[in-house]
Swiss-Prot record:
Species per Swiss-Prot/TrEMBL record: Campylobacter fetus subsp. fetus (strain 82-40)
UniProt keyword annotation of Cell wall biogenesis/degradation present: no
Protein EC: 7.1.2.2
Matches recorded under Gene3D superfamilies: 2.40.30.20, ATP synthase alpha/beta chain, C-terminal domain, P-loop containing nucleotide triphosphate hydrolases
Protein name: ATP synthase subunit alpha
A single cellular component GO annotation: proton-transporting ATP synthase complex
Keyword terms: ATP synthesis, ATP-binding, Cell inner membrane, Cell membrane, CF(1), Hydrogen ion transport, Ion transport, Membrane, Nucleotide-binding, Translocase, Transport
Site feature: Required for activity: 364
Length: 505
């Protein structure tokens, strides 16, 4: 039996096949390594590569295109460059760097690419985000108005921090900068704030100690640690803060609150300088490249308090800068001071004289935190800054003058006690209601007849006494967030009763 084929049927089938024919050809643009040194590869042949694009070397190492020149491309290697040789092939990946974000990262230690380095298995993240994002515009933001309590009396009373603020912690080495940051993380327990600690160029042992301390206080339950240590490639140290802020933005954009600590941006700038000089970019002041200001401004501008329309989430940044011999007028410190909303200045002289945290009250300032402070602490610490400044002035004068008048002597004695009140051991942040009570006691003269050496003992015994006899004082300050007449009367009564039973010995 013969099958008759109609010509029009055949032509329609052929036509359909031609129309549906899908020729997908994978065109991979590859290049060759001309030279490689110090974590930077010079590559020839990647004519269409974009700035910031990811590439892959034949050894499996990833890289990022940073310098686009006429005949070659400068690529920073994200990992070990020792296996890459001259003549190795490099292929474009056609994508920008992304890092995993979300709740799966909480409690983990990751590198600058978001890969786990804590031997606790893979991270099951459901979402990734670009590492470089544009900071939110003016209309997307809201002014800072909620407090972010650090648990440190000197900070919450004198240089308060609000959610969505950028507050710089600046000081010489060994002045307790990291301790202030860790105390702040520990104090966020139960506050529904996700913390991100970014370690840049630190020793592995130092980072291990920080993680151990956070675990000890149960803070790793709400903390992500991003580590690009001193032994990592400069490119990873450069990327670590951007990876951290990307993870923080996820929580901010989902109507949650996050806190990010960059420890520290001095080493970040040094890593960027190292990369830039190897890429042969022209050096500027202190051999830093011309765009080192933009390096930090685009990072810190990503911290913000979002408007109610966008969910009212917040991302607070606490960058750390290490100064050399207290020189805050160096290039990187002045840059970051001008970008942030205030600074907490730690001094080695204060630290060595036993005043810890070693905060210089005169030089420390919070430009927007005042509007975020709760009324109670604002009331009790209102004149504290002025009193301490006058005390410091009198103290300098008293070294030369032996006969002081009665009011000056009283001011000097109260100042000594207030300095004692503001001292605090590390890793012991105080709830805000406790801070209100002790600062009130100091500023209202309840400590004037207590020996200076007994102030710490007075404070340690005061809280349990009030908790046992007048628990409503704590509760009312916590709930009302203000110090009204009734609370003040009850507090005054409690302090007088406690003083009658207190023994300085």
């Amino acid at each position: 039996m013969s099958v008759k084929l109609k010509a029009d049927e055949i032509s329609s089938i052929i036509k359909e096949r031609i129309e549906n024919y899908n020729l997908s050809v994978d065109i991979e643009e590859t290049g060759k390594v001309i030279s490689v040194a110090d974590g930077v590869a010079n590559v020839y042949g990647l004519k269409n590569v974009m700035a910031g694009e990811m590439v892959e070397f034949e050894t499996g190492e990833k890289g990022m295109a940073l310098n686009l020149e006429e005949s070659s491309v400068g690529i920073v290697v994200l990992g070990k460059s020792s296996s890459i040789k001259e003549g190795s092939s490099v292929k474009r990946l056609g994508k920008l760097l992304r890092v995993p974000v979300g709740d799966a990262l909480i409690g983990r230690v990751v590198n600058a690419l978001g890969e786990p380095i804590d031997a606790k298995g893979a991270i099951e993240a459901t979402e990734t985000r670009f590492i470089e994002e544009k900071a939110k515009g003016i209309m997307a933001r809201k002014s800072v108005h909620e407090p972010l309590q650090t648990g440190i009396k000197a900070i919450d009373g004198l240089v308060p921090i609000g959610r969505g603020q950028r507050e710089l912690i600046i000081g010489d080495r060994q002045t307790g900068k990291t301790t202030v940051a860790i105390d702040t993380i520990i104090n966020q327990k139960g506050q529904d704030v996700i913390c991100i600690y970014v370690a840049i160029g630190q020793k592995q042992s130092t980072v291990a100690q920080v993680v151990k301390k956070l675990e000890e206080y149960g803070a790793m339950d709400y903390t992500i640690v991003v580590n690009a240590s001193a032994s990592d490639a400069p490119a990873l140290q450069y990327l670590a803060p951007y990876a951290g802020v990307t993870m923080g933005e996820y929580f901010r954009d989902n109507s949650r609150h996050a806190l990010i600590i960059y420890d520290d941006l001095s080493k970040h700038a040094v890593a960027y300088r190292e990369m830039s000089l190897i890429l042969r970019r022209p050096p500027g002041r202190e051999a830093y490249p011309g765009d080192v200001f933009y390096l930090h401004s685009r990072l810190l501008e990503r911290a913000s308090k979002l408007s109610d329309k966008l969910g009212a989430g917040s991302l607070t940044a606490l960058p750390i800068i290490e100064t050399q011999a207290g020189d805050v007028s160096a290039y990187i410190p002045t840059n970051v001071i001008s970008i942030t909303d205030g600074q907490i200045f730690l001094e080695s002289d204060l630290f060595n004289s036993g005043i810890r945290p070693a905060i210089n009250v005169g030089l420390s300032v919070s430009r927007v935190g005042g509007s975020a402070q709760i009324k109670a602490i604002k009331k009790v610490s209102g004149t504290l800054r002025l009193d301490l400044a006058q005390y410091r002035e009198l103290q300098a004068f008293a070294q030369f003058a032996s006969d002081l008048d009665e009011s000056s002597r009283k001011q000097l004695e109260r100042g000594q006690r207030m300095v004692e009140v503001l001292k605090q051991p590390p890793y012991s942040p105080l709830p805000v209601e406790n801070q209100v009570i002790i600062i009130y006691a100091g500023s209202q003269g309840y400590l004037d007849d207590i020996p200076v050496s007994a102030v710490t003992k007075f404070e340690a015994e005061l809280y349990p006494y009030i908790e046992a006899k007048y628990p409503e004082i704590f509760e009312q300050i916590r709930n009302k967030k203000a110090l009204d007449k009734d609370i003040e009367e009850a507090l005054s009564k409690a302090l007088n009763e406690f003083k009658a039973t207190f023994s300085a010995e």
